[in-house]
Amino acid sequence: MNRKDEHLSLAKAFHKEKSNDFDRVRFVHQSFAESAVNEVDISTSFLSFQLPQPFYVNAMTGGSQRAKEINQQLGIIAKETGLLVATGSVSAALKDASLADTYQIMRKENPDGLIFANIGAGLGVEEAKRALDLFQANALQIHVNVPQELVMPEGDRDFTNWLTKIEAIVQAVEVPVIVKEVGFGMSQETLEKLTSIGVQAADVSGQGGTSFTQIENARRKKRELSFLDDWGQSTVISLLESQNWQKKLTILGSGGVRNSLDIVKGLALGAKSMGVAGTILASLMSKNGLENTLALVQQWQEEVKMLYTLLGKKTTEELTSTALVLDPVLVNWCHNRGIDSTVFAKR
């Protein structure tokens, strides 16, 4: 079994809905919504993209025949629903051209859709351009994943030039570049560094869903690094960390998104759109995966409309004026990190 298929099997094995920091955020219910479902517009826009719903499928897989089947199904679902989809890391196809079709199948199924290509931060300008050319990607995701690399038996050990390489790519390619974590979250300091090198967008991708340290540790013979299973900031904390950067960077959120309520909470905390991966992957890998996942996406579209209505909001942009209350764990984090946690409850 190659590493890509190992990741798929382990992600499925470890996937379970569990409590996370989205449960520490509560909306303030208002009895008079003064809204109607048929008046709600759940579309969103960021960078140069207009999207019919405020969530997307985040980077998952590619580089094997099993992964090709999943990407084909994602392409079909995206065409049917208008979903933006990001591929898994295309590094495998850059090393072995015979694997290119495991990613290109998504474009074949969805020729006019929005698809992001994904590469690691250790790659350079030429690899970035080749990744975009694989299937005429609309944007480039560059993932940063130091904890995963360190736990991965064959992972990278030198991260000294990542920022320099990202900056060079930002200057060289003609499409937007989104820097994405892989489930470990982002801090204020990280966002400041990304802004300083000209990055336009960041997907803070926090802890709370799929743990790639857990997955990579399961691939180690002794499995001795389990203490890193929950390393990092949650998606909610990462969005709180991003508050002072949301006017300078396009902020996207992902990591541990289980349902439509999590999506709307992330939007209320300032994300322009929310990415989903683990929940979608688990659905696709179940019996009747394609049909079930298409139904799930359509269900979420309707539920998001209901939630906007419940909150008395007619557009995605209005959600950032919705009152919400953070529990003491989140308030304590904000206090220690110099973030004003009181503003959310008074909006």
UniProtKB/Swiss-Prot annotation:
One of its GO terms (biological process) is isoprenoid biosynthetic process. Its main location: cytoplasm. It comes from the Bacteria. Mg(2+) binds at E149. GO terms for molecular function: FMN binding; isopentenyl-diphosphate delta-isomerase activity; magnesium ion binding; NADPH binding; oxidoreductase activity. Keywords: Cytoplasm, Flavoprotein, FMN, Isomerase, Isoprene biosynthesis, Magnesium, Metal-binding, NADP. GO terms for cellular component: cytoplasm. It is found in: Cytoplasm. Gene3D superfamilies: Aldolase class I. Transmembrane segments: none annotated. SUPFAM superfamilies: FMN-linked oxidoreductases. FMN binds at A59, M60, T61, S89, N118, K180, S205, T210, G256, V257, R258, A277, G278. It is an enzyme of class 5 (isomerase). Pfam families: FMN_dh. The keyword Magnesium applies. Its cofactor is FMN; NADPH; Mg(2+). It catalyses: isopentenyl diphosphate = dimethylallyl diphosphate. Signal peptide: none annotated. Its EC number is 5.3.3.2. Substrate binds at R3, K4, Q148. Homooctamer. Dimer of tetramers. Involved in the biosynthesis of isoprenoids. Catalyzes the 1,3-allylic rearrangement of the homoallylic substrate isopentenyl (IPP) to its allylic isomer, dimethylallyl diphosphate (DMAPP). Belongs to the IPP isomerase type 2 family. This is Isopentenyl-diphosphate delta-isomerase.
